[in-house]
A protein has these predicted regions:
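Polyanion-binding catalytic cores of nucleic-acid enzymes and NTP/SAM-utilizing transferases
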Residues: 1
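N-terminal pre-triad scaffold of radical SAM enzymes
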Residues: 4-41
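Conserved Radical SAM active-site core
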Residues: 7, 38-133
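Generic marker of residues within folded, mature protein domains
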Residues: 20-22, 79, 189, 219
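Short aromatic/hydrophobic contact patches that present stacked aromatics
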Residues: 29, 86-88, 167-169
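Conserved Rossmann-like nucleotide-binding pocket used by diverse enzymes
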Residues: 31, 90, 198
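Conserved AdoMet/S-adenosylmethionine-binding subsite of the radical SAM
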Residues: 96-240
Length: 240
């Protein structure tokens, strides 16, 4: 078995979370390069493949860079009384490097960080390897209308493992079908009707109609307790 000692890192930076339940939260971001999918609406398509812009780093090198960026911005966290700064582990798809993350994430926890995993929720076996280190899991449901195939089985298994650590995000485009929204809500309800669902309309391309968003929201709300319609704020303010 090959031991993974380095992963391709596209960027490490400080910003504010721009989407989902934690919109506005100051975070450090660790963006890994490489993904197991190619979704039509992807807003970080530059990180799908491992390009020359990605640097292969060890866990110690990543920790050092994260600590450096945190120290540069720690006054932001202090002013907001945030004792445990949050790191968003994102991509690409970070769980393709689950074996590496098993070594990195404990080091980040030991250094006082809380961990926020952003994932396409298609690799439940990989999630099992790191779930105990994750504080929050932002999982995207991927629809056949955009990705060309369904992942309902994987999404349900992913939710079973994540349980109360997760919320679900669905990107809505003009191609999204009502049945995909209903199916998403039913899959979530099969685990817990209290898991939050974020309906996130695309604002770049294939923009959905307002009436469709209203219909999708109303149908999901019939099934789940917590449904929200939210756009990506970082795109409005043109920040990362």
């Amino acid at each position: 078995m090959t031991v993974v000692t380095k992963v391709p890192v596209y960027e490490i930076f400080f910003s504010f979370q721009g989407e989902g339940l934690y919109t506005g939260l100051p975070q450090l971001f660790l963006r890994l390069a490489g993904c197991n999918l190619q979704c039509g609406y992807c807003d970080t398509s530059y990180s799908i493949i491992v390009s020359k812009k990605a640097k292969c780093l060890t866990s110690d090198e990543i920790l050092k860079k994260l600590c450096f960026i945190y120290n540069k911005n720690k006054n932001v966290f202090k002013r907001l009384d945030i004792d445990r700064p949050s790191i968003s582990i994102t991509g690409g798809e970070p769980l393709i490097y689950a074996d590496f993350l098993k070594g990195l994430l404990p080091k980040l926890k030991e250094n006082g960080f809380s961990l926020y995993l952003e994932t396409n929720a298609t690799l439940p076996k990989n999630l099992k390897k790191v779930i105990k280190f994750c504080d929050v899991i932002s999982m995207d449901f991927k629809f056949p209308s955009e990705c060309g195939k369904s992942f309902w089985k994987e999404h349900k298994e992913f939710l079973k493992i994540s349980k109360n650590k997760a919320f679900v995000k669905c990107v809505i485009t003009k191609n999204t079908k009502l049945q995909e929204i209903i199916k998403s809500a039913e899959v979530i309800k099969s685990i817990s009707k209290n898991i939050s669902l974020i309906l996130q309309p695309s604002i770049d391309k294939n923009i959905p109609a307002i009436q469709d968003l209203y219909t999708f929201y109303c149908q999901a709300k019939k099934i789940l307790s917590n449904v929200y319609l939210m756009i990506q704020m970082h795109k409005i303010y043109n920040i990362r």
